[in-house]
């Protein structure tokens, strides 16, 4: 389980300028056009979703700084930039190497055992499944991991 994060706006012009065709209409936390931007999951580095105007964390900040957008999670909790920084950008260190890695104890008899997991956490999306999905991800200039595809 993890938590999904969104950026949303009620401004149609901002939607058209920054979201292109990739948005959803939602009523949580209020009526907004939203775009999925990130997910945090236990043991993993945060994962960000790339889009038309978002290719880096700096791009998310740029949208937020226009004051036409809000950031919130799937439960409707709104975040200012400092709260988003604490909750998402620093989650499990945020980028590979920011915190010491710890060995994952693997029990082949456990119902939760996953042969594709790397040996250490926090887990990078580049390492999962022995790198089979690495081409679906890229790092922004700050080292945050972005997916080229939609996910939730």
Where are these regions (language model features)?
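Low-complexity intrinsically disordered segments
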Residues: 26-152
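Short, extreme N-terminal segment that most often corresponds to the first beta-strand
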Residues: 1-24, 150-152
